Amino acid sequence: MNITVISVGKLKEKYLKQAIDEYSKRLSRYCKLEIIELPDEKTPDNASEKEELQIKEKEGKLILSKIKDNMHVIAMDLKGNEITSEKFSKYIENCGVMGNSNITFVIGGSLGLSQEVIKRADYKLCFSKMTFPHQLFRVMLLEQVYRAFRIMKNEPYHK
């Protein structure tokens, strides 16, 4: 299985890079992982709604340029489905069974995802109604993907 994470924003913090490296190493037993890091657009402090929309659309075009036709796209979105780790594991497993072996997770920038990216998504997923820094969220996502594979294989980790 191929897992791709497309994320807007550069990872700067060393501790987050170390966590990403650790989960990337752990996931290498289960899948081929690719992380695509895209630059985020600078948002002015007092940006208007129109300016924010333009920024999301610009980031969205960049995201869409990285998505291939054969990718099963999961958009990380506050309006998405909230599911348990077990159901997440089953979802990933079912993707493989249905022939969707190229799963792509999309993490937007600080303003979220454009409507075009949301429309392209095959599934919308929400980890929480709380807001997280998108750099930290990348670590959280990889941990949940790792947990999902461990659950799938009935290996100890998840409690």
Curated annotation (Swiss-Prot):
It is found in: Cytoplasm. It catalyses: pseudouridine(1915) in 23S rRNA + S-adenosyl-L-methionine = N(3)-methylpseudouridine(1915) in 23S rRNA + S-adenosyl-L-homocysteine + H(+). S-adenosyl-L-methionine binds at residues 108, 127-132. Keywords: Cytoplasm, Methyltransferase, rRNA processing, S-adenosyl-L-methionine, Transferase. GO terms for cellular component: cytoplasm. The keyword Transferase applies. Gene3D superfamilies: 3.40.1280.10. Homodimer. Specifically methylates the pseudouridine at position 1915 (m3Psi1915) in 23S rRNA. This is Ribosomal RNA large subunit methyltransferase H. It comes from Clostridium perfringens (strain 13 / Type A).
